[in-house]
Amino acid sequence: ESPEISAKWSNELQKRAETLPYGIPINLSSDPRNGAKDSGAEFKSGGSEISKWPEGVGFAACFDPEVAGQFAKDASREYRALGITTALGPQIDLCTEPRWMRFVDTLGEEVEMSKKLTKAYCDGMQTTEGEADGWGKDSVNTMVKHWPGGGTGEAGRDAHYAFGQFAVYPTGNFEEHLKPFTEAAFHLDGPTDCASAVMPYYTVSYGVDKKNGKNVGNSYSEYLIKDLLRGKYEFKGIVCTDWGITQDPEKTIEGFGSRCYGVQDMTEAERCLLAITNGVDQFGGNSESGPIVEAYKIGCEKYGEKAMRERMELSAKRLLINIFHCGLFEDPYLDPEESAKIVGCEEFCRHGYEAQQKSIVLLKNSAKRAPEGQKGVLPLKKGLKVYIP
């Protein structure tokens, strides 16, 4: 929809929030929406009147963190003008498996470049210039994904479907996939210091948990969330599950449904409790509070009411901090006319077009590298000078 309509919708939501107990503002989130071409995939939507930029792997092709940083600065202004205060990204998976359908949104496969781009992206999104701690009216929380690295799917199969549930490490490079998180997103150069949220992926990181020997979805793994993310790497922000991991699984392996991998025998409430005790704060895509209330009751019986209340209040604190970051308690409302001037403005569109140009990679159809009996790597028509796939 148009920026004006988005701004009006945001204002109406915030008005409604004011009437509820405690009057806590709404923190709206969005998947990437500035791609030059809408992917058409179920996990991503384009923006109709927003500036257009390269996809994640296009930023990698620029070999220039400043381009990613400029995008993040411009996109954060557009997001705020639309009422969005959390970006479900950047997607900082090292894409060592090029057959994965989400390759396009990653920042490439090279760890050092990915780290530089991650820092530039998160700093640009989260930082409001002139604010001592970086947080302010132009800030958008970043939710880096997918812990502990989603570019590891077996044979490139995608974990939105049960046939892609396993992440594998045939060369033993698990730690390499952590580096964009542990050496970049959690140690930013800018004043906000750290990405404010993390999203674990659906996958079962097969054989990684040597402590408990459990092969379960990442959010259900005590080792990956409690011991590594919260413990060893001391991440203090929000942990939000990927979308739809708590419901019962689909009947067929091809079904696009719940991804409760490894904990299918539990009830939904038991799954919620397991994730909460690991250190998860938020359940992506869940709109029913019933299973979480039931999880709390089970937890009170198992751990005691005092312990469960303290645990729930800790998550509440983390969630509230990200709302305070963006100044929503001070003023959550937008001026629709001002939003229309910001979103897709000439300056941002020019920056996006320049980035698209810089991301283009020219390949030579070399005869030296061609298969036997072929005049080039690609079997193109004779006399063709330029080929655009």
At which residue positions do the language-model features occur?
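Glycoside hydrolase catalytic-domain context in secreted enzymes
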Residues: 1-389
